[in-house]
Structure formats: structure tokens, C-alpha cells
């Protein structure tokens, strides 16, 4: 640390500027939320591809429900404590989110999951803000909290979709 850093003088200002410049070189080392939360499975055969993912940015994270990426965070019920995060309500299995208050008939995909012994929970999220964030009425999330599929209606062939996302094809 420069000795003059605390001085109220031009030497002190120069010392502070020198330290600022040195600290700024570490920005990407510490400000890497884009790397941490923006990791994706693009091109994976166990993801039902849908659209182009957000551009890679090592510093900034852009929440997106495009399959292959980590599911976006959403605060439930206006809370900030345990149980108020959507992540807190996810199980250790595949989870089908029904978003925005539309109770789509998910019986066919639930039946296909039972037939394949794929653990699946259906979670109703009536918040329209969540629907806006996820951009679809239905989102299928893997146990590792990555989006596997999304749509505005149940998949036309749920057995085929499940076979794909569990690697059975």
C-alpha cells in the first residue's frame, strides 16, 4: 500500500488512483456471476432445444428459461426468507412448473413419467411475474435445476420428450 494513500494532497490522490487502477484489474476475477449462473448445456442431447440462449457474458447474468440453462430465480409470495424462493420449493426430481395461473392439463406427461419411472412433481406458480420471467406457461426443470423443456401447451408426445431428457433415446 502506498504510504501517501491517506494524505489529503496530490500525492495522496495519485496513490489512491494507483490503487483503484490495480483493484480494477481484478474485476473479472471476482465479478463472475455470469460464469457462475450462466453455465449452459447448449447442444446437449438431453435438452429439448428452444431458441437462442442469451449471449455469453462472464460478468453479468441474464436470467432465461431457454432450455439448457439454469432456471431463473423467483421470489414467491413477496417474501425473502426460507421457503419464499422458488428454488426452496423444488424437489430432488424433475419438476413441471405451471406458471401464471393457467392450470394446463398435465395428465399425459404425468402418466408418461410414471410409465418410465421418472420422478416428476407438478408445481403451480400462479404469479404472472413468474410467467413473464419464464416466458412460457409450462417449464420442465431437471433435478439439477436446469431447464429441460418449455412450452405454452403440454408436449404433443410426452413419452418421447421424457425419453429424450432422461437419455433413453
List where the protein language model places each region.
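Helical substrate-recognition/capping region of FAD-dependent monooxygenase/halogenase enzymes
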Residues: 1-169
Amino acid at each position: 500500500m502506498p504510504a501517501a494513500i491517506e494524505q489529503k494532497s496530490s500525492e495522496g490522490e495519485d496513490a489512491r488512483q494507483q490503487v483503484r487502477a490495480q483493484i480494477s484489474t481484478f474485476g473479472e476475477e471476482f465479478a463472475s456471476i455470469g460464469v457462475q449462473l450462466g453455465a449452459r448445456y447448449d447442444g446437449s442431447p438431453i435438452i429439448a432445444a428452444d431458441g437462442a440462449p442469451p449471449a455469453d457474458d462472464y460478468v453479468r447474468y441474464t436470467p432465461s428459461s431457454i432450455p439448457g440453462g439454469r432456471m431463473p430465480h423467483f421470489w414467491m409470495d413477496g417474501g425473502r426468507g426460507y421457503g419464499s424462493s422458488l428454488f426452496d420449493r423444488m424437489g430432488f426430481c424433475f419438476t413441471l412448473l405451471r406458471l401464471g395461473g393457467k392450470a394446463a392439463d398435465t395428465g399425459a406427461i404425468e402418466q408418461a413419467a410414471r410409465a418410465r419411472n421418472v420422478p416428476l412433481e407438478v408445481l403451480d406458480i400462479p404469479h404472472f411475474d413468474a410467467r413473464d420471467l419464464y416466458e412460457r406457461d409450462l417449464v420442465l426443470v431437471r433435478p439439477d435445476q436446469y431447464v429441460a423443456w418449455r412450452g405454452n401447451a403440454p408436449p404433443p408426445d410426452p413419452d418421447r420428450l421424457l425419453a429424450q431428457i432422461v437419455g433413453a433415446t
